[in-house]
Amino acid sequence: MATLYDNEAKIKQAIVLLQKVVNDTSVPRNIRRAASDAIRNLQDPSLSPAVRAANATAILDEISQDPNMPSQTRISIWNVVSILETIRD
């Protein structure tokens, strides 16, 4: 069973990767907005780590199909989703 510390470390890692997407001006605005929303969900202290990860994954999964997304951004989003999918309560 994953410890809370492990989950929080994974969430912090995901936030760092998403922050890079948000700060990249070559990424379309709607994708940056979705990444910001995912970060906000990940930082919500009222929810358990698994729920925060699931909420963020839902946002990122939806936006990952955008045809306007640059390839390197899509790969970053997939990496974040992979990290978040390992979070369990």
UniProtKB/Swiss-Prot annotation:
Pfam family, one: UPF0147
InterPro entries: Ta0600-like_sf, UPF0147
Cleaved signal peptide residues: none
Coiled-coil stretches noted in the UniProt entry, renumbered to this chain: none
Stated family: Belongs to the UPF0147 family.
Protein name: UPF0147 protein Msed_2034
Source organism per UniProt: Metallosphaera sedula (strain ATCC 51363 / DSM 5348 / JCM 9185 / NBRC 15509 / TH2)
